[in-house]
A protein has these predicted regions:
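Conserved alpha-helix/loop element of class I SAM-dependent methyltransferases that forms part
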Residues: 2-10
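Extreme N-terminal starter segment of soluble prokaryotic enzymes
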Residues: 12-15
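SAM cofactor-binding core of SAM-dependent methyltransferases
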Residues: 17-66, 81
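Active-site beta-alpha loop architecture of Rossmann-like, nucleotide-cofactor-dependent enzymes
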Residues: 87
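Short alpha-helical patches at coil-to-helix transitions and adjacent helical residues
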Residues: 23, 162, 169, 362-370
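Short SAM/SAH-binding signature in class I
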Residues: 77-83
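C-terminal target-recognition/interaction regions appended to catalytic cores
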Residues: 2, 264-431
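Class I S-adenosyl-L-methionine
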Residues: 67-77, 91-302
C-alpha cells in the first residue's frame, strides 16, 4: 500500500471527498482500504494534524467551497462522505437542532423540490444554531454535482452522525430513492441504521446513525455485519454472552486490550505500563459526564470494559490505576495517543496543533469507518489484513507535510479567518 504522502504530487485519482473531515477518521479508513481521499476542514488545528499525517486537505468552509470553489474538487471524486458537526443534535450539546428536527426534515424536502435557497437559508438562520444547517450540506453538494456541467452524480454517499439524526437520514434516504426534483431523475439505493461501535472492534461504546447510498446497479445495500458482541455490563462475563442472538462470537474489545496491544508496537507513544499495578491492568475511569440524568453521578468503567464514548472532553475523564489512587484522590488522565487508540486511530498517528482532545473526540473511529466504507464501496467487510495494517500509520516526509500545507493553506486569504487563531506550528520529525 502506498503511503498517504503519495497523494500530494497529483490530486488525480482521488475517489473520496470527506466533508467536515476533522483530523481524518474517514480518510484514515479510506487509506487502509486503498482509496485516495481529500478532506475539507474548517478548523486549522485539525488541518495541522491532517497535514502531519499526509492527508490531502482543503482548509475551508464547506458551504463556501460548494458555492465559490466547487471547480477545485478533483473530477475523479466518486464518493461523497462526511459527518456534519453533531453538537447541535447531540444529547451532550444544547439541543437546538434536536428541537428543530421536524423543521429540518421539511428543509430537506424543500431543497430537493426547488424552493428558493435564500429563503431556506433565512429560515435555517432563524433556528438559532448555525450548525443545524450543516446537516443539509451533503445534499447540497450532491445537487451541485448534478447541476454542474461536466460533473457526474456521486456513485456512493456515506454519512454519519449522532443517533438523534437518524430521522433526518431516513428523509435523506426517501428523497434519494425518489430521484425527484433537483435530483433530476438520479435515483439511489439508500439505507440507514444505528450502529454500535463496540460491535465493530472499537474499544468504546458509541452509537452512530449511518446512511449508505449507491447508484442502482451496484448491488443491494445491506447492514454492515457486526464482528463483535455488544457491550452490556449487566449481563456479567462478556464471554458468556449468547452469541446465537447476535451471530458473532468475538467479545467486545476492552480498554486494557486496546492499550496493551498499542503499547507493544514498535516506537509506540502508548506506554501501558504506567497504568499497571503490580504488573496487571486494574485501572478504572470516572466519566466527565453524569449518568441517569444526575450530573453528580459520574459513570465508571473498569479496564476490562470498553471506554465510554470518547468526546472532546476525554481529557477530563479521571483515570485511577487502582483503589488506593482513588481513595487518595490521585487521578491520572488518558494521553492523546491513548485517547486516539480508544478511537482506533493508529498508535503513532501524528496529532498536531491545539485542542487535540477535541480533535480526537470529534473524529469518526477509523475502524468503524473502514467497515462502513467497505460496505458502501465493496458490499463486504474489510479484510483481516487491512484491519491489522490499520494499527500503524506510515511515516510522512517533512517535505510532504509542507507541500500539503501549501495546498491546503497556501493562500490564507481564502482560509476561514476565525480558524487561524492557533499557536505557531511546531516542526516535528517524521513518525
Amino acid at each position: 500500500m502506498n503511503g498517504p504522502g503519495t497523494q500530494v504530487q497529483h490530486l488525480d485519482g482521488i475517489r473520496v471527498l470527506d466533508l467536515f473531515a476533522g483530523p481524518g477518521g474517514l480518510d484514515v479508513a479510506a487509506h487502509f482500504l486503498g482509496y485516495k481521499s481529500i478532506g475539507i476542514e474548517w478548523d486549522r488545528n485539525a488541518c495541522e494534524t491532517r497535514y502531519a499525517a499526509g492527508l490531502a486537505t482543503i482548509h475551508a468552509d464547506v458551504s463556501v467551497m460548494r458555492k465559490n470553489r466547487f471547480d477545485e474538487i478533483p473530477r475523479s471524486v466518486e464518493v461523497l462522505a462526511g459527518g456534519p458537526p453533531c453538537q447541535s443534535f447531540s444529547v451532550a450539546g444544547k439541543g437546538a437542532g434536536l428541537q428543530a428536527l421536524e423543521r429540518v426534515k421539511q428543509f430537506i424536502r424543500r431543497l430537493v423540490h426547488g424552493e428558493s435557497e435564500a429563503e431556506i437559508d433565512e429560515d435555517l438562520h432563524n433556528l438559532g444554531d448555525p450548525r443545524t444547517a450543516l446537516v443539509l450540506e451533503p445534499l447540497r453538494w450532491l445537487i451541485k454535482a448534478i447541476e454542474t456541467e461536466e460533473r457526474e452524480p456521486y456513485k456512493a454517499i456515506v454519512l454519519e452522525q449522532v443517533p438523534t439524526v437518524l430521522p433526518l437520514w431516513e428523509v435523506y434516504a426517501e428523497v434519494l430513492r425518489s430521484g425527484e426534483g433537483r435530483l433530476n431523475g438520479h435515483k439511489y439505493e439508500a439505507e440507514c441504521w444505528v450502529l454500535r461501535t463496540e460491535q465493530f472492534g472499537v474499544p468504546q461504546t458509541r452509537t452512530r446513525a449511518v446512511l449508505v447510498a449507491r447508484r442502482p446497479g451496484l448491488g443491494a445495500i445491506v447492514r454492515p455485519t457486526a464482528t463483535h458482541l455488544p457491550f452490556d455490563r449487566h449481563r456479567g462475563d462478556r464471554r458468556k454472552a449468547d452469541s446465537r442472538i447476535f451471530g458473532v462470537e468475538r467479545p467486545w474489545i476492552s480498554m486494557a486490550e486496546a492499550l496493551e496491544s498499542a503499547s507493544e508496537l514498535d516506537g509506540s507513544p502508548v506506554d501501558a505500563s504506567r497504568l499497571r499495578t503490580n504488573g496487571s491492568m486494574e485501572f478504572f475511569v470516572i466519566s466527565n459526564y453524569g449518568s441517569g440524568g444526575d450530573p453528580k453521578n459520574r459513570g465508571r468503567r473498569d479496564s476490562s470494559e470498553p471506554a465510554f464514548t470518547v468526546t472532546g472532553k476525554v481529557s477530563r475523564n479521571k483515570v485511577y490505576r487502582n483503589k488506593a489512587d482513588f481513595e487518595a484522590n490521585e487521578p491520572d488522565r488518558f494521553t492523546i495517543p491513548e485517547s486516539g487508540v480508544l478511537q482506533t486511530f493508529p498508535h503513532n498517528f501524528p496529532w498536531s496543533g491545539k485542542d487535540q482532545a477535541q480533535q480526537v473526540g470529534n473524529a469518526v473511529p477509523p475502524r468503524l469507518g473502514m467497515h462502513v466504507l467497505s460496505n458502501a464501496l465493496r458490499g463486504e467487510a474489510p479484510s483481516t489484513e487491512e484491519l491489522r495494517a490499520a494499527a500503524t500509520w506510515p511515516a510522512v516526509p517533512p517535505a510532504t507535510v509542507e507541500e500539503l500545507r501549501a495546498i491546503g493553506c497556501g493562500d490564507q486569504s481564502r482560509c476561514p479567518p476565525e480558524s487561524h487563531k492557533v499557536s505557531p506550528v511546531r516542526r516535528r520529525s517524521a513518525p
